[in-house]
Structure formats: C-alpha cells, structure tokens
C-alpha cells in the first residue's frame, strides 16, 4: 500500500486530452512502483486497471495487473474465500458492465461468478455485456458539465437496469457506482434499490 506516494493513474487527464498531465502522473507512478520492485498490482477501478495494464508498459511500467472482480473470482474458485451468511440469497441482482472492464478488457464473467456465489438471482437486462450502455462517466465525462439534451446518460442507464426490478444494482467500478447511485436517487428509488460494488456484496454477506 503506497498511501501518499500513490498518484492518480492519469486516466482522466488523458481522456480529457491533457497528455502532459497523464505523462507526468504515469511516470511518477512508474518510478515509485519500480523503485519498490512491484510486480503485481490489484486495482478496484477498471479505469486504473486498463491504464496500468495496457498503457503503462509503453512507459516502462510492466506489471501483472488484476481487477478485484477477477481476484475475488479466483479466491472463491480456489476455496480461499468462503461466501457464507446468505444475506443476498434469492435477492434479485442485476449487474452493470463497466466499459473498461468489459469492452476494453473482455472481463464479463468474473463479476457475475462472484454474484452467483451469493446464491442470488442474477437477472440480466437486454443491454448488457458488450451491448451495455456506459454509465456516463467514461472518457472523462464525469468531470464535464451537462450537455444539451433530454436526459442524462446515467439516468437512461439506471432506467434500463430498473426494468428487471432489481433489489440491487451491482457494479465493479467506483465511477459506475457514483453515476448509478445518482441515477437511482433521481428516480426516487434509493429506499428500494441499492447500488453496491461486488466487494461490498461479499463483505456484507459475510458479516463485515
């Protein structure tokens, strides 16, 4: 754990077109990571995962990079993480695919395997996996003011997810979590539908 030595990966800067800031942040991180001899990195953000895995190698940062969805799946499959408690047994859970986890890195099944381990009722919407709609935060859009239009993207995506009447909308990305939480609040459904990261689901199920 690097603490204050860890800087942003630079993903938002590069997506927003500020290559100078991206290069500065990336090189700072790579120097720190290489200085400690880091070989494996676990991320909880698909944006960080994609940047470190696919963009840092060109700058001298070569690491084995895991997203926590894959890591949790491995722990469950290897019997190192017991999913006990049954807090979500039979609950209707739909999963929103992160763009950078799914389309960019083809990780679709790992988060679903984690949800299924809860003995929950995993319900898919029509627009899922490669056909899923962005939550509205990708490409540095999270930091932009709203553009003219009839509906915010996060509201549209939330409405799609609500079509299957879920108890929980599961995510594996902090950006998606924020955008869909706001979407649920916009629909005044925050008392009925929870937006939770798959790691939160496991932790709550196991009593943490």
Give the location of each predicted region.
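Iron-sulfur cluster-binding electron-transfer modules in prokaryotic oxidoreductases
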Residues: 1-208
């Amino acid at each position: 754990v690097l603490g204050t030595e860890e800087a942003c990966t630079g993903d938002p800067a590069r997506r927003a077109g500020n290559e100078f800031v991206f290069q500065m942040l990336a090189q700072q991180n790579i120097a720190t990571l290489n200085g400690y001899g880091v070989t494996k990195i676990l991320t909880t953000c698909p944006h960080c995962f994609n940047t470190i895995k696919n963009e840092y190698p060109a700058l001298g940062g070569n690491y084995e990079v895991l997203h926590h969805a894959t890591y949790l799946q491995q722990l469950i499959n290897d019997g190192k993480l017991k999913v006990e408690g049954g807090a979500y047994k039979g609950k209707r859970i739909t999963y929103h695919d992160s763009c950078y986890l799914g389309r960019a890195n083809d990780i679709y099944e790992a988060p679903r395997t984690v949800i299924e381990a809860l003995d929950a009722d995993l319900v898919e919407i029509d627009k899922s996996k490669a056909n899923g709609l962005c939550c509205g935060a990708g490409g540095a859009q999270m930091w932009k003011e709203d553009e003219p239009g009839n509906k915010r993207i996060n509201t549209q995506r939330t409405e799609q997810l609500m079509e299957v009447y879920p108890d929980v909308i599961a995510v594996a990305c902090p950006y998606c979590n924020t955008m869909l939480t706001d979407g649920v609040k916009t629909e005044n459904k925050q008392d009925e539908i929870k937006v939770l990261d798959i790691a939160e689901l496991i932790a709550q199920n196991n009593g943490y």
